[in-house]
Amino acid sequence: MKITTKVLIIGSGPAGLSAAIYTARSSLKPILINGMQPGGQLTMTTDVENYPGFAKTIQGPWLMEQMSIQAKNVGTEIINDYVERVDLSKRPFKIFTGTGNKYEADSIIICTGAESKWLGITSEQEFRGFGVSSCAICDGFFFKNQDIVVVGGGNSALEEALYLTNHANKVTVVHRRNSFRAEKILQDRLFKNPKISVIWDHVIDEIVGSNQPKTVTGVKIKNVYTNEINLVNCSGVFIAIGHTPNTTLFNGQIAIDDDNYIITQTGSTRTSVEGVFAAGDVQDKIYRQAITAAASGCMAALEVAKFLNK
C-alpha cells in the first residue's frame, strides 16, 4: 500500500517524538514510524534524574510513553513498523517498511538513534543471551544474588552497575583507564556502594563459560600495561562501552562522517540532501542526552515547517 505524507519521521526516541509534537502542532499531519525499539534508548533506562520538569526521579519507559501519548494527542499518526529501505534520490522521498508498505514523503526527519557497542570478541558473541547483555533493566533480574561484571567507564556503565546492585550479590566494574568519565554524582554513588568494586586499567580478554548448560562462569581480564591476565568469576557480563549511530539505512545516500554519524549543517538539522533532516543521537556525537535529542527534534520540526512553506 502506498501512503503519502508531508512529513515522515523515522524513529521514536526523544528526538522523533519531539519532532512529531512540533510538526503536528504546525498542522503538517506527520507520520512517525516507531522502528524496532519504540521509545529508543530511554526505554532501557530505569532512573531518569536529569530531564527538566520532574522534581523526583522518573522512569525512562514512562517518560517515553508520555511523549508518545502527547504526540498522538496533537495529531501524529504513529505506525508500529520499521524501515527496510529508503530512496532519497529525489522528492517525494520513498520509504519502504518491513510490513510491505511504501511511503512517499515531501520531507523526512531521521531520528534513528544509536545502538549498543560490543567488544567484538568471539566469546562475547558466543555467550550473548546466555550471560552476556547490554541492558541491565532487561536482564538484571536473571542474576539475582549472583556476581556480575560491568564493562565501561561512562554514564551508562555506572548507571548499569548501580541498577544491578538491586539484584546482584556483587558488581565488579572493569574499566580500561584509571578514572571514569561519568558524571561526578554517579561516581560518588558508585564509590559509596558496598556492593560495587572497580578494577582499573584492564580490558576483557575473554568471556569464559560452560556449554552444559550454556552459561557464563567468568571473564579473563588483561592489564593494559603489563598484559597480565587474571580471572574474575561471575555469572553475567554487561557491556556498556557506548553506542553506534543507526545509519546503515542511509549509506551512500546522505553525507555520513567517519564515525557513521549523519553530518548536519552547523547550528541546523539539515543534512546533505535538501528536505532531509536529522535529529538526536544519530547526528550528535558530543552531547547525547535525552534533553538535547528532544531539543534537536524540535529544531528539525521547525526547519521542516519552514522548508515546506517555501
From Swiss-Prot:
Any one Pfam family match given in the protein's UniProt record, by short name: Pyr_redox_2
GO BP terms in the entry: removal of superoxide radicals
EC number(s) per entry: 1.8.1.9
Source superkingdom: Bacteria
A cellular component annotation (GO) from this entry: cytoplasm
Cofactor: FAD
PROSITE patterns given in the database record: PYRIDINE_REDOX_2
Disulfide bonds: C135-C138
Residues reported in the UniProt entry to bind FAD: 34-41, 281-290
Enzyme class: oxidoreductase
Reaction(s) catalysed (UniProt annotation): [thioredoxin]-dithiol + NADP(+) = [thioredoxin]-disulfide + NADPH + H(+)
Keyword annotations: Cytoplasm, Disulfide bond, FAD, Flavoprotein, NADP, Oxidoreductase, Redox-active center
Subcellular locations according to the entry: Cytoplasm
GO molecular function terms listed in the Swiss-Prot or TrEMBL record: thioredoxin-disulfide reductase (NADPH) activity
Comment on bound cofactor: Binds 1 FAD per subunit.
Gene3D superfamilies reported for this sequence: FAD/NAD(P)-binding domain (3.50.50.60)
InterPro entries in UniProt: FAD/NAD-bd_sf, FAD/NAD-binding_dom, Ferredoxin-NADP_redctase_2, Pyr_nucl-diS_OxRdtase_2_AS, Thioredox_Rdtase
Chief place of localization: cytoplasm
Miscellaneous section: The active site is a redox-active disulfide bond.
Assembly behavior: Homodimer.
Similarity comment text for this entry: Belongs to the class-II pyridine nucleotide-disulfide oxidoreductase family.
Stated name of the protein: Thioredoxin reductase
Protein's organism: Rickettsia typhi (strain ATCC VR-144 / Wilmington)
